[in-house]
């Protein structure tokens, strides 16, 4: 089982950069959303723990599914049928894996 996150120590290095605390504090609105949403992080350490867990899941999906599908997706490519785009079969598999993991919409606001 490949994991593009845990297998790449450079990613972890960047996430522990001293500026990350300031970035996370800004992104998380100084952790005020924790008062409204029980799943919002309460502090920097909690946020980093959440990021780490999500990235482990994403890294596993990328290592086990997305990466191995890449060459086939490039070879097959998308097509247009009756004015509608049809994804390569590997793209559908990738999207379904991300959906099943609950990762679709991760960048949307909590409310």
Segments the model singles out, each with a brief description of its role:
Residues 59-60, 90-111:
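Internal helix-loop-helix
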Residues 1-81, 85:
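Extended, charge-enriched "interface" segments that sit outside catalytic cores
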